[in-house]
Design a protein with these regions (language model features):
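Anionic-ligand anchoring segments at beta-strand to alpha-helix junctions in alpha/beta enzyme folds, i.e.
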Residues: 48-51, 193, 364, 380-382
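Residue-level detector of alpha-helix initiation sites
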Residues: 37, 171-175, 349, 353
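N-terminal leader/targeting and accessory segments in enzymes
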Residues: 2-145, 149-151, 378-379
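Active-site regions of enzymes building and remodeling cell-envelope glycoconjugates
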Residues: 73-80, 126, 293-302, 319
């Protein structure tokens, strides 16, 4: 499409491996940096793995202090509040795994509490992982346990992992996440949204564990912070809705922010052989450059679609949401009028097309998806969730 490739989607902690499935949690000393919503969820989940936990927090009285103190009553937690910033690198002595809360930048260019300690951990070969890595470990472990439980003694069943749909972008993430989950539920799937939208990734895992019912589809809203810290991620389908300059108080520069967004299409996997369906807004050059290395792609935009399976708008007196035929791009299927959306705007029409493209990775049946789309009202406005120490903004 004449768009040059952007910087490769590299993490500041790229060479540290992901968490192996055979990880011995009870013998592990895990350090959690920050105890916002994400940090608290990590702590609760780690307690279930019987890990020994240290928590470092620069605030003397973080918002979740009462819940944190209730958890602190359990012997395997060492709680350290009101620490000077930056955290002393010596804190990482004797630690096996460090989990930074997403709002803490690892970059020395930004005066935050975590960067010096993370640099020391990296130099010493200490494993650093993000909450997305814990989430991925948890769902793989649950699938493995289910496979073992259901198998005959002499038969190993193939691992049946849930579908994972991932959404990122500078704007529109929450609406698209809600849309995709609502559409799939209307189509008969057990779909669970989580991530930058509430509940957090691990709070959702814990709730599903308690219900003894994992969803068929996870619909994840992911911020650039969460993606930057992750060491491995293999979604079923992922979309980057759009990219504009944002959160340069966390990222090294705009290129670093763009690279983090591109990680939604997969981390630690071979892009040339990947089975991930990569979806993007074709009128955003940054998004299209991120998609360029990938094999399976689908686009959406405000003009008519011109590739098989792509989505767009077509003006025929009214504005129609359309999809190009998967066998003949010249044939376009009218899906519904854009004005039939209850959340009516050109921006939400793009969110709706992105949600449809994501859901098509789960089911080819368009009719129930379109019925649900006509009824979708949204209802959750932009929300600011402080995920960590000194994090003033959310939804990057």
């Amino acid at each position: 499409m004449g768009i040059s490739k952007t910087v490769s989607a590299a993490s500041p902690l790229e060479r540290v491996p992901a968490i192996p499935m055979a990880f011995d949690w009870p013998s592990c000393h895990v350090m959690v940096l920050g105890c916002g919503e994400s940090g608290l969820a990590c702590i609760r989940w780690l307690l279930r793995q019987n890990a020994r936990i240290s928590v470092l927090e620069s605030r003397a009285a973080p918002p979740g202090l009462e819940r944190l103190q209730a958890l602190d009553g359990q012997q395997q937690i060492a709680l350290h509040l009101g620490l000077a910033s930056p955290f002393d690198p010596s804190w990482c002595e004797g630690v096996d795994l460090i989990i930074p809360s997403p709002g803490l930048s690892p970059h020395p260019e930004h005066a935050g509490p975590a960067h010096a300690l993370l640099a020391a951990a990296r130099a010493r070969g200490i494993r650093v992982a993000g909450e997305l890595d814990l989430f991925e470990w948890a769902i793989h472990h649950a699938a493995h346990a289910s496979s073992q439980r259901d198998a005959a003694p002499d038969l190993a069943l193939p691992l049946e992992l849930p579908k994972i749909l991932a959404i990122t972008g500078t704007n529109g993430k929450t609406t698209t996440t809600q849309m995709a989950a609502a559409l799939l539920r209307r189509a008969g799937f057990d779909a669970q949204e989580a991530g930058n939208i509430s509940p957090s990734l691990l709070d959702a895992v814990i709730a599903r564990e308690d219900a003894s019912r994992f969803p068929e589809v996870w619909v994840l809203e992911l911020s650039s912070f969460q993606l930057a810290y992750a060491q491995h991620f293999h979604p079923t389908a992922a979309v980057c809705l759009n990219i504009s300059e944002d959160h340069l108080d966390w990222h090294r520069d705009f290129e670093d922010y763009v690279a983090a967004k591109g990680r939604v299409y997969g981390i630690g996997i071979d892009t040339a052989r990947s089975d991930v369906l990569c979806i993007g807004y074709r009128q955003d050059a940054q998004v299209m450059a991120l998609m360029a290395p990938h094999v399976h792609t689908c686009t959406f935009g405000t003009e008519p679609p011109n590739r098989p399976g792509d989505f767009g708008l077509q003006e025929e007196g009214i504005s129609w949401m359309t999809m190009a035929d998967i066998h003949d791009e010249a044939q376009r299927h009218r899906l519904m009028p854009a004005d039939a959306l209850r959340v009516r705007s050109r921006h939400n029409a793009m969110n709706a097309l992105a949600a449809l493209a994501l859901c098509r990775a789960v089911t080819p049946a368009l009719a129930p998806l379109l019925h649900a789309l006509r009824e979708f009202r949204g209802g959750v406005s932009w929300r600011c969730t402080s995920h960590a120490v000194d994090c003033a903004s959310a939804g990057p």
